[in-house]
Structures are given as C-alpha cells and as structure tokens.
Amino acid sequence: MKHMLQICCKNNNISKEFPIGSSLLDIYYGFNLNFPYQVVSAKVNNRSEGLNFRVYNNKDVEFLDIRDSSGMRTYVRSLCFILYKAVSELFPEGKLFVEHPVSKGYFCNLRIGRSIELEDVTAIKKRMQEIIAENIPYHRVECHTTEAVRIFSERGMNDKVKLLETSGSLYTYYYTLGDTVDYYYGNLLPSTGFIWLFDIVKYYDGLLLRIPNKENPNVLEEVVKQEKMLDVFKEHLRWNYIMGLGNVGDFNMACEEGHATDLINVAEALQEKKIAQIADDIYHRGENGNRVKLVLIS
C-alpha cells in the first residue's frame, strides 16, 4: 500500500489524498481545476514554489496563473532563460543583460561587438520560438556552492561567481535548460512549452522583451514609450559604474571589505550633484521666460 498525504487545495477548499512525493503539477491535474489561463506556479503553505516541486508532507496548496504577481514573475524568469539560451547559441561571445522593467516590458542590453540590427532581433525571436516548440524541461540542480562557482566560472559568468561567493550559502540551486546553465533566485516553469506569448523588439540601443498583459494574458502589454525613465535607469547604471558596482556581487564584496561608508558618501555626492543640475536647469529656464511652477523628484 502506498503511503499517502493530504493536500488541501485553497482554490476550491477541497482536500484529497496523493502519493508522497507527488509534484505540484500532478496535484494540479488531480484536482481537475478549471483555470481560464495556464497555471504557472503555486503557493505551498503560502510559500511560492514551482510546479515541479514535490510534496512529502500534508500541505495547503493554492495554484496560481499569470494574473498573480508571483505567477507573472515565474513566467518572466522562464522567458528570460529562453532569451539567454537563444542569445548564447546565436552569439557565443555576446553578453546579455536584462536590466530594467520599462515600457511595460524589460529592457535588455545585448553586447555583441557591434550595433544590433533588425536581422539579429528576428533571428533571436525565431530561435526562442523553436526552443518553446521543443518543450525543453527546466531542471533545478542543487550542489555545493563551491561547485556552482566552478561551473559559472568556467562559463565566464563572473557576475554569478561574485554573487555566489558572497551569498554565505553552503549549498546553491541553479537551473539548466538543455546544455545551458543559469542562476535564478526564484522558481521556473516545468518546461519551455508553458510559454505561450512573448515578443522581442529592437528598442533604442537595446532590446525590449514584451510580456503578456496581467489582466488579459492572451494579449501582449502595449509598449509605452518611456524615454525619460530609460534615461534615469541608464544614469543609475553610470553611477554604479563610478562606484565600481556592476552587480550585487560587487556590492557584497565592497561591504565585506569595509567600503560601505565610502559607497554611501559617493552616492550622496552624486545625488547632490544631480539636485544642483536640476536647480541650474530651473534657473536657465526662468531666464528664457519658461518659468517653472512645479518640480517633481522621485
């Protein structure tokens, strides 16, 4: 006789028995729930987990689709992994940085040693669609952090190396998609076939990864031009460069080496300089007859 466990589904307040070690995806199918959109993740005792997560004790489970913020993050992370895999295959020497949520999508900086052409974007999108059609499973791997550092170091992923070296964790989870390896702080979908809608377009000097609308996931978010917001993000990156901070690992290392106060002082100096520039701009506009009545600083 199989050992069973009790699962209480919060979506319909029904409890059922399942074999110990059942995955959340198996449990979802067992409850025969009727969602208007694809279920992408679940909350197990109010903690977000991927659908490949296996349950070994009695739990409360609530399944989530893309309309939930946690579900949307799972979808976007999984989509970013597909984008990374496509780019790494098409441009082995290139570097991809998913930088900012802007224009109701995600701005991506792709460095391939030249300007990005429309043909490049078309090739990336085509390869992403092929990866989705292949329905490749995402695998989560647990290993000793020193082993994970070695794996990412061999692949030249120095930002991941610094992050893991300063995480303070003895063991680390990373993900594989075919022969592609990456690190994500959060859950991914069971396989690439769970992605049903996306777009990738040229956007200023980079790419814009478009995602489904949260309220109506059957359509993409409308692109809203946000030049000023993009400029603010880019200025923030320049400030980080001045402070020697390219990623979270750099920040962690700076703090470990006792430079936290220096970082704060430099950041405050940059902010004071920016405020002075705003004051100069207000003054010069007044000289030209364009009196400023209201200034909003976020």
Where in this protein do the model-derived segments appear?
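Ubiquitin-like/PB1-type beta-grasp interaction modules and other compact soluble beta-rich domains
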Residues: 1-80, 84-85, 91-102, 113, ...
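Auxiliary tRNA-acceptor-end handling modules of aminoacyl-tRNA synthetases
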Residues: 53-72, 95-103, 107-291, 296
